[in-house]
Amino acid sequence: MVHWSAEEKQLITSVWSKVNVEECGAEALARLLIVYPWTQRFFDNFGNLSSPTAIIGNPKVRAHGKKVLSSFGEAVKNLDNIKNTYAKLSELHCEKLHVDPENFRLLGNILIIVLAAHFTKDFTPTCQAVWQKLVSVVAHALAYKYH
């Protein structure tokens, strides 16, 4: 179990309270698909992913990005129980979807970039360190069923 100090929890919740889940989720997933194009193979039913413009404008990318970031919000609500929060999602991604668990880490790092771009004033190095810890814990929880 991961320990979160009161300051860490406050930094997480203060940034999260400002996040537009639809906008940031769409941007994070689009960036993942553009920067790491091999991740597109998990989204072959999304239609046109042939260029950055196509990916950014793809409504299925937007919708799934919102879904992913909404799910990430569950970690924010359950900081002391992240592993159990993602148990079913880990099983789904491992046993049914066969997603490489490294992709969770990549998406977490992309989320850090998106948050830093959107909240430049609030996203101090200390805040970044806390969010890096959070995305690492979430990635580990999502990869749990792979072990």
From Swiss-Prot:
Could you state a single Gene Ontology molecular function term? oxygen binding
> What is one GO cellular-component annotation here?
haptoglobin-hemoglobin complex
Where on this chain does heme b bind?
H64, H93
Q: Name one GO biological process term.
A: cellular oxidant detoxification
Give the coiled coil ranges.
none
Keywords carried by this UniProt record: Heme, Iron, Metal-binding, Oxygen transport, Transport
What region holds the Globin domain?
Answer: 3-147
One protein family per Pfam: Globin
Q: Which InterPro entries match?
A: Globin, Globin-like_sf, Globin/Proto, Hemoglobin_b, Hemoglobin_oxygen_transport
The superkingdom of the source organism is Eukaryota
Entry-linked SUPFAM superfamilies: Globin-like (SSF46458)
Family of the protein in this entry = Belongs to the globin family.
Q: Which PANTHER family match?
A: HEMOGLOBIN FAMILY MEMBER, HEMOGLOBIN SUBUNIT EPSILON
Give the function comment from the record: The rho chain is the major early embryonic beta-type hemoglobin chain.
Q: What is the protein name stated in its UniProt record?
A: Hemoglobin subunit rho
**Which source organism?**
Gallus gallus (Chicken)
List the lineage, top down: Eukaryota, Metazoa, Chordata, Craniata, Vertebrata
